[in-house]
Amino acid sequence: MAFETILVDVADGILTITLHRPDRMNAFTPLMMREMVAAFDQADADDAVRAVIVTGSGERAFCAGADLGAGAATFDYKDRADRFDLGSPLRDDGSVDLSHPGARDNGGRLTLRIFNCRKPVIGAINGAAVGIGATMLLPMDFRLASTSARFGFVFARRGIVPEAASSWFLPRLVGIETALEWCYSGKVFGAAEAHDKKLVRALHAPEDLLPAARALARELTADSAPVSVALTRQMLWRMLGAAHPMEAHRIDSRMIWARGAASDAAEGIASFLEKRPAHFVDSVSAGLPHAADYFVDPDYF
């Protein structure tokens, strides 16, 4: 599939998505959202892909946020030049149909797709990550950053509010106090603060960033069953919002029952007893166990 705003490469079991609008500091557009969603669909459908890395083109920016080329109309649907291409959520009386896809936040549509990905996702932040450039990172499993990276949840400085479901993700990653500080002030801060506050896992020299991300991807997946990884990703992320450990017990019980009868479980035990590498054959593309139907997203509206 040909893309206009991103580059997609598959090598050594890793699908790498590179945000590719270097002349605009990889600024985010509705087309980029759709193309990134399609790339994650590709990753989930390809059993040769064991992990996903997301990075940016050039040395200046990972993603400088939403493309503000529309000026003051950037976040005002009724004044946008592309509103007819998107389909109109405006009713004849001028009110907004909030159930219409055109009324949804594009950043949230992307982060929810990343949240539902069946492969580990690693962010390799090579430069400025501001606005949606910062919030799209939050549902990724690991974030590695260049020492020159900068971050900013700048929404209050633009007269808007945090988007991309970041009000759910960010406090869970860094705590409510840090999340409020960053979002109230809208300040842009450096890689050292991001690392200190646990937004990023590690800092690397720019030339070492992608090699480190690839090494981590291989470490995470080399000896693990793909279906087990897919299920584990959903279990751990979704239980962040559980009201009681009984919810985890329910899903654990369903998944152990389903996976215990799978060929991968027999192979995992046999390989351990025989002291040899495991050869797992169950595939993510063939579908997850019926018990995974427990993972049902709420309706948008």
Question: Model features per residue range: what roles?
Answer:
Residues 112-227, 262, 266:
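Crotonase-fold acyl-CoA enzyme core
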Residues 22, 144-149, 200-250, 258, ...:
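C-terminal long alpha-helix characteristic of the crotonase
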Residues 3, 46, 117-118, 262, ...:
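Acidic-histidine catalytic/liganding microenvironments
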Residues 182-186, 232-235, 256, 272:
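Short alpha-helical scaffolding segments that buttress acidic/His motifs in well-ordered protein cores
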Residues 17, 21, 35-36, 54, ...:
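Terminal peptide-recognition signature
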Residues 56-113, 129, 159, 243:
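Glycine- (often His-adjacent) and acidic-residue-rich active-site loop
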Residues 28, 101, 124-125:
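Structural motif
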Residues 1-55, 59, 72-76, 292-301:
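Conserved CoA-thioester-binding segment of acyl-CoA-metabolizing enzymes
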